[in-house]
Amino acid sequence: MARSGWKTAGLIAGAGCLSIIAIIIGGGIIATMYARATVRSFGDPNPQSVERRIALSPPPAEANPPGAKGEASRTAPLHVRLELQEGTFTIQPGQPGTELQVQGRFAPGLFELTESHSTDPTGAREARVRFHSKAPAWARFFAGIGNGDEDGPELTITIPRGTPIDLTLEVSVGRSQIDLGGLTLGDVNVTATMGEHRLDFREPVVKNVRELRFSNSMGNLSLEHIGNARPETINATGSMGNVTADLAGAWSPGSESNLRFDQSMGDLTVRVPSNVRVNADVRSSQGGESTNRTPALKQSDDPKAPTLRLHVTSSMGNARVIQD
């Protein structure tokens, strides 16, 4: 009787497990079919090549809105805003001109590339480029099950040299390779979220950048050759991710710059070149205890060496200031 009871219990348990598996498989099939129908409702899900030119040339003087300061509006830098989500993105300098060039490949039924232009009452102009998904993330996930589709969206944006701009860049959920070297930049504001992002200044900018602002969360951000931007000010914040900042580059001789890095829940590494003078203040907070330390850095003996006033704070993570 005991063996028969155990056998019956085993059969019942086995049948229950098979039922659960069948429900999961059936639910997955239904979810996949519904997701694919949802995706098709947005349009063509097949990737297509795209090439677009976006004019950055200033509007005619008579097009300035009433009350605008005509001369100021013609000479003020154009504000370029790039908002890029869910893809692999490359941003690079191009030949002199007055157009942004956008090239890439994506499914028009799943993603959308838009542009807009505006002028505020002061005459300041803005060009905005936005790339984002149209279909819900859950639908794209389930629709991709079983079809081996790994052809995600890719975009390359080329910024013309010689056009003065203030740049706002927001990149999220993806990968980015960004090179802003050789451009004419005023203020630069970069926000990177959820992904692997690399920003470089491979060659010196035309004129010193007034302010560099970086924000990184839930991902990794690598900053290379920051000295080639010759920034007067850097403000960088990071949380739930890692940040590496290389300060090498062609800093302006005799210049003074204020650099601030604030990091929480992640690692921060700041690499300092040997051809600058550095006043460093590094503060760390761990478990309710705060420490203040001054890293041992070699100071340049060149009387024209640039001076970097570096302030670093970290909490629930590790911050290092090192010298190559």
Predicted regions: what is each one?
Residues A61, Q101-F106, E112-P121, R128-G146, ...:
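Short, surface-exposed interaction patches in beta-rich subdomains
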Residues T168-K207:
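Right-handed parallel beta-helix
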Residues E51, P77-H79, E86, G152-E154, ...:
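Surface-exposed or flexible loop/turn and strand-edge residues in extracellular/cell-surface modules
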